[in-house]
Structure formats: structure tokens, C-alpha cells
From Swiss-Prot:
Assembly and binders: Interacts with MMP1, MMP3, MMP10 and MMP13, but has only very low affinity for MMP14. Interacts with CD63; identified in a complex with CD63 and ITGB1.
Signal sequence coordinates: 1-23
Species annotation: Macaca mulatta
Protein name: Metalloproteinase inhibitor 1
Protein family (similarity comment): Belongs to the protease inhibitor I35 (TIMP) family.
Keywords: Disulfide bond, Glycoprotein, Growth factor, Metal-binding, Metalloenzyme inhibitor, Metalloprotease inhibitor, Phosphoprotein, Protease inhibitor, Secreted, Signal, Zinc
Pfam families: TIMP
Matches recorded under CDD domains: NTR_TIMP (cd03585)
PTM: The activity of TIMP1 is dependent on the presence of disulfide bonds. N-glycosylated.
Sites where the protein binds Zn(2+): 24
Phosphoserine: residues bearing it: 178
Region Involved in metalloproteinase-binding: start-end pairs: 24-27, 90-91
Cell compartment(s), UniProt: Secreted
């Protein structure tokens, strides 16, 4: 059956390319949720053009990591991350990096698969300079405090109520029409006492 393998691969690739285009839609998470649900959170520069693997239909970007905030244990003995991987098509949530500034730093929160960093359109990837000082504080130090006990619970429609004392209602989208509202830019869901989490200002935690 070996002679048919190239043909089969070609057919699969053709079906992939001619499939109806469907926009990938997702709601961006609160930065704390992105931090807690990611295996690896780093600051890095995109320094290379994307390279597409025609076999896996994934593309990779060469990056230069400047800081790691989460993932030391998950990464194991690997000292550095040199590439980030994503689906090669936007219709299946592939991330396309549009900035041509190779000196610009980005906050990248992604998943590790077989030791490789993977991201999608739905991943938290943002220019470091676009983050508020409170968000930078969160990624650097504070978000991790709420990962085990607390959950940011999106409130997208009324009525909306807490399902647990450890949940914090996230109303940015409902009240401000954007996931980048006040709670996202300035607050973290952190333990107040055993069994209770509340929104707390990251400003007051800044040195």
C-alpha cells in the first residue's frame, strides 16, 4: 500500500484547501484565565517569517524568548523556546502574526504538545506594551495566586449569578461590549478567605 500514501496525502491536502472557508470565532478569555489555563506563558519577539509544513498543515514562527512567567516545570530540561506552532489556516483558528516589527515583545500564552508551544487565534497573544501595568503585574506575579482556588466566570447575558463562592463574575463583555474592559485590565479573581474568591485590584498590589 506504500505507493498510495503520497496520493492519499495529496487528496487530504486538496480536501483541506477546497473546504468551505469558515471563520474561527472565539471569545477572548480574561488574562487570568489565559494564564491559569496555559502550560506556558512567555514574553517573546517574533523574529522569523512563518514556515508551513505541508504534511501536518501547521506553520511555525521563529521567536526569541525574553522572559518566562509560567512553564518551568512543564518545559523540563529545555532551556529555551525557539518556535511557536499554529494551524496553517485561519478557518481552523490558525494564528497569523501581522506585526512586522521584530523588536516588539509579545505576551504569549499557549499549550505544550510534545514539548512544542502551540497557539491559536483564541490564545492570549498581545503586544507587551498594550497591556496595562496591572495586567503586567498579574502575569508577572499575581494571577498564579488565584489559579487553584478561583475561577473567572463570564457573564454574557442577564440574569447571571455566581455558581460558587470561588467564582468571580466577569461582566466586561455584557456591560462594556468588550473583553478588554475594566475587570480585564485592572482586576484579578483572588482568594479572600477559604471558599471565597473576590475581584481584587492589581493596582493596590503594585510595589
Amino acid at each position: 500500500m506504500a505507493p498510495f500514501e503520497p496520493l492519499a496525502s495529496g487528496i487530504l491536502l486538496l480536501l483541506w484547501l477546497i473546504a468551505p472557508s469558515r471563520a474561527c470565532t472565539c471569545v477572548l478569555p480574561h488574562p487570568q484565565t489565559a494564564f491559569c489555563n496555559s502550560d506556558l506563558v512567555i514574553r517573546a519577539k517574533f523574529v522569523g517569517t512563518p514556515e508551513v509544513n505541508q504534511t501536518t498543515l501547521y506553520q511555525r514562527y521563529e521567536i526569541k524568548m525574553t522572559k518566562m512567567y509560567k512553564g518551568f516545570q512543564a518545559l523540563g530540561d529545555a532551556a529555551d523556546i525557539r518556535f511557536v506552532y499554529t494551524p496553517a489556516m485561519e478557518s481552523v483558528c490558525g494564528y497569523f502574526h501581522r506585526s512586522h516589527n521584530r523588536s516588539e515583545e509579545f505576551l504569549i500564552a499557549g499549550k505544550l504538545q510534545d514539548g512544542l508551544l502551540h497557539i491559536t487565534t483564541c490564545s492570549f497573544v498581545a503586544p507587551w506594551n498594550s497591556l496595562s501595568l496591572a495586567q503586567r503585574r498579574g502575569f508577572t506575579k499575581t494571577y498564579t495566586v488565584g489559579c487553584e482556588e478561583c475561577t473567572v466566570f463570564p457573564c454574557l447575558s442577564i440574569p447571571c449569578k455566581l455558581q460558587s463562592g470561588t467564582h468571580c463574575l466577569w461582566t466586561d463583555q455584557l456591560l462594556q461590549g468588550s473583553e478588554k474592559g475594566f475587570q480585564s485590565r485592572h482586576l484579578a479573581c483572588l482568594p479572600r478567605e477559604p471558599g471565597l474568591c473576590t475581584w481584587q485590584s492589581l493596582r493596590t498590589r503594585m510595589a
